[in-house]
Amino acid sequence: MSKTLLVMAGGTGGHVFPGLAVADRLKAQGWTIHWLGTADRMEAELVPAHGYPISFIDIQGVRGNGIKRLLVAPYRIVKSVLQARRVLKTIRPDVVLGMGGFASGPGGVAAWLSGIPLLLHEQNAAAGLTNKLLARLAKRVLMAFPGAFAPSRRTAVVGNPVRPEVVALPDPQLRSGAEPLRLLIVGGSLGARVLNEQVPPAVAAAGVPIEVRHQCGKGNRDAVAEAYAKQGVAAEVSEFIKDMAGAYAWADLVVCRAGALTVSEVAAAGVAAIFVPLPHAVDDHQTRNALTLVDGGAAEFLPQSELTTASLAARLSWLAGRRETLLNMAQAARRVAITDAAERVADECKRLATGQIEREL
């Protein structure tokens, strides 16, 4: 008999894309997939575009948003839990998979109240508040990186599901190029203002030949392209890179934030990186994410407070002349990567749906 999975994931690509990777794998095995999200975030368009039906609940974040929002938060949470329960009664899933985003909290509570097995996946090296709370209700808690939760019989490290075309990239040694240095800048879907402002002059000041591809975020292309032009640097600037696998394959070095999915893709691709974590990320999770590769010799760490034209130019100049170092970093990244994460999460869903996990616990 066909099984049904309800995926709760939304808000950012770091939540949605791993959820889609798991959904695609289970769909190929005959499962029915449904989604729970919010109507004003990216999942509202992205999930239907991938062929999956989605239901919406009304919920917003409550951390750090002022007294008024905190006062009305209990009412909104109860309302969203009731909305999620109605969705569950209609869909009747065998398993509910929480991948993060605003809908995961109410949806996870609704699953527990409805007696439906709840499986959590924490993408970051530091667990978020919602998953910390839901972990008490979940049958199983999966982690992308060690340390997000204390080891127990209910937890497992499975990695972050990444795009299969990234996993399929050839060995870094086969991609290692000669001069000039090929530099990929990844700022995320919204771009990273500090990278958009600091990288163009740093490339010019490095004093070595560098080819640049810069993903700058929506609405920033003209300004960033002009910044490179003023510095006399030829650069390919785009708001969004559709073929990230191709971009990673091209690059000798990536300069980027340290979101969970970015760190996992850098590792899976096997490419050297300089991470500039978002300094105000909740619980400083981007620093924790970055250190999983930095500590393994696969990447360098550059706090935003230390990012200047001079500091970045010096690092680019130094690395450009050390191809063996870049290759060693890329190979170290590949060794750290968990490339079958989507399969591992899908297997946990199947074990939960058949009661195997209940028997083991």
Curated annotation (Swiss-Prot):
Family the UniProt entry places it in: Belongs to the glycosyltransferase 28 family. MurG subfamily.
Catalytic activity: di-trans,octa-cis-undecaprenyl diphospho-N-acetyl-alpha-D-muramoyl-L-alanyl-D-glutamyl-meso-2,6-diaminopimeloyl-D-alanyl-D-alanine + UDP-N-acetyl-alpha-D-glucosamine = di-trans,octa-cis-undecaprenyl diphospho-[N-acetyl-alpha-D-glucosaminyl-(1->4)]-N-acetyl-alpha-D-muramoyl-L-alanyl-D-glutamyl-meso-2,6-diaminopimeloyl-D-alanyl-D-alanine + UDP + H(+)
Primary localization: membrane
Taxonomic lineage of the native organism: Bacteria, Pseudomonadati, Pseudomonadota, Gammaproteobacteria, Aeromonadales
Signal peptide: none
GO MF term list: UDP-N-acetyl-D-glucosamine:N-acetylmuramoyl-L-alanyl-D-glutamyl-meso-2,6-diaminopimelyl-D-alanyl-D-alanine-diphosphoundecaprenol 4-beta-N-acetylglucosaminlytransferase activity; undecaprenyldiphospho-muramoylpentapeptide beta-N-acetylglucosaminyltransferase activity
Residues binding UDP-N-acetyl-alpha-D-glucosamine, per UniProt: T12, G13, G14, N124, R163, S189, I241, A260, L261, T262, V263, S264, E265, Q286
Keywords: Cell cycle, Cell division, Cell inner membrane, Cell membrane, Cell shape, Cell wall biogenesis/degradation, Glycosyltransferase, Membrane, Peptidoglycan synthesis, Transferase
Subcellular location: Cell inner membrane
CDD domains, per the entry: GT28_MurG (cd03785)
Classification via InterPro entries: GlcNAc_MurG (IPR006009), Glyco_trans_28_C (IPR007235), GlycoTrans_28_N (IPR004276)
Chain segments annotated as coiled-coil in the UniProt record: none
UniProt EC number: 2.4.1.227
Gene Ontology BP terms: carbohydrate metabolic process; cell division; cell wall organization; lipid glycosylation; peptidoglycan biosynthetic process; regulation of cell shape
Organism: Aeromonas hydrophila subsp. hydrophila (strain ATCC 7966 / DSM 30187 / BCRC 13018 / CCUG 14551 / JCM 1027 / KCTC 2358 / NCIMB 9240 / NCTC 8049)
Tagged with keyword Cell division: yes
Pathway: Cell wall biogenesis; peptidoglycan biosynthesis
EC top class named in words: transferase
Topology of the protein relative to the lipid bilayer: Peripheral membrane protein
Annotated protein name in UniProt: UDP-N-acetylglucosamine--N-acetylmuramyl-(pentapeptide) pyrophosphoryl-undecaprenol N-acetylglucosamine transferase
Function: Cell wall formation. Catalyzes the transfer of a GlcNAc subunit on undecaprenyl-pyrophosphoryl-MurNAc-pentapeptide (lipid intermediate I) to form undecaprenyl-pyrophosphoryl-MurNAc-(pentapeptide)GlcNAc (lipid intermediate II).
PANTHER family per record: GLYCOSYLTRANSFERASE, UDP-N-ACETYLGLUCOSAMINE--N-ACETYLMURAMYL-(PENTAPEPTIDE) PYROPHOSPHORYL-UNDECAPRENOL N-ACETYLGLUCOSAMINE TRANSFERASE 1
Any Gene Ontology CC annotation: plasma membrane
Gene that encodes it: murG
